[in-house]
Amino acid sequence: MSNIIKALEEEQMKSGLPKFAPGDTVVVQVKVKEGDRERLQAFEGVVIAIRNRGLHSAFTVRKISNGEGVERTFQTHSPIVDSIEVKRRGAVRRAKLYYLRERSGKSARIKEKLAKK
C-alpha cells in the first residue's frame, strides 16, 4: 500500500529545483490568476525555514515591503510555484531563522557565503 502512495507522490514531485538553504536570498515566481488571465509574480526574500517532507515539502521566504515584514510559505512542489532562482547564498548557523522577525535594519543582514575553491 505505501509503495503505491510513494510512487504516486514521486510522480507529482518537481525535478530540476535548485538547491537552497536557510539564509539564501531567492526569487520565487508565483502563478497568480486574475479573472480569466494568469500571470507570474516575483516574490524575492530570504529563506528563513525549510520543511523537507517529500511531496509535502515547504519553505518560508521573508522580505521587507514598505517597511513591513512579509512572510510567505510556499509548497515546494506546488503547481502555483513556477520557478525558484537563488540570488545569493547566505552564511548562517541555524536551520530556522525566526530570530530575524524581531530584527530590522543592519542587524537583520546575513553574511554572504563565499564559494569554496
UniProtKB/Swiss-Prot annotation:
GO biological process assignments: translation
GO CC, one annotated term: cytosolic large ribosomal subunit
Keywords per UniProt: Ribonucleoprotein, Ribosomal protein
UniProt key word Ribosomal protein: yes
GO MF annotation terms: structural constituent of ribosome
InterPro entries per UniProt: Ribosomal_bL19, Ribosomal_bL19_CS, Ribosomal_bL19_sf, Translation_prot_SH3-like_sf
Function comment: This protein is located at the 30S-50S ribosomal subunit interface and may play a role in the structure and function of the aminoacyl-tRNA binding site.
Protein family: Belongs to the bacterial ribosomal protein bL19 family.
Protein name, per record: Large ribosomal subunit protein bL19
The organism of origin for this protein: Vibrio parahaemolyticus serotype O3:K6 (strain RIMD 2210633)
Lineage: Bacteria, Pseudomonadati, Pseudomonadota, Gammaproteobacteria, Vibrionales
